[in-house]
Amino acid sequence: MKRIGAITIGQSPRVDVVPEMQQILGPDVEIVQAGVLDGLSPEEIAALAPAGNGDSEIRRLRGSPVLVSRLRDGSWVSMEEEKILPLVQKKIEQLENAGVRFILMLCTGKFPENFVCRVPLIFPQKLLYSLVPQLAGRIGILTPEASQLADSRRQWGAVAQQVTVCCANPYAGAAGLAAAAEQFVKDGAEICVLDCF
């Protein structure tokens, strides 16, 4: 049986994502999950929250975007990317020691490329930025937190012809998702990307 690693920046298991991946990959592939927040206390998780007043421009200039992820109980948290990078490295090492053939990050955030990894490490963001503009010229980007809007506009605007960016947290109910979908239709988006979900 082939083993692949999957790192969530929240807690594992990701019962909202991995079962669908498993169906696509089939029974001959074992997905070994590792959560960056696994084993941390509520206080330790709270310490990873973004600092400051929530201004994404300040964080962008400092170089530490906000990431959002799911906890095991279905709730969600926001984290400052810079604060979780050492924890990501530990999960990479954990999965390497488990004998995985490659590791997939279950996050579309743009991560630095200085992780030490002996197996291929796949970042969905790189795939999306290459593939999505080939599929459509008018793109709808859905991001879970308002503080991510400016970063998403800047990053996706560099690779797409026309970008509409909306905010709706998938972990907080469907109302925001419906409003975002209406905005995408109004703006003529040909495809919708769930960015940082």
PLM feature segments, named:
Residues 5-9, 14-15, 181-197:
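Extended, histidine- and acidic-residue-enriched regions that form the cofactor-binding/catalytic faces
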Residues 75-124, 190-195:
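N-terminal glycine-rich phosphate/adenylate-binding segment common to multiple enzyme folds
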Residues 43, 86, 170-182:
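Structural motif
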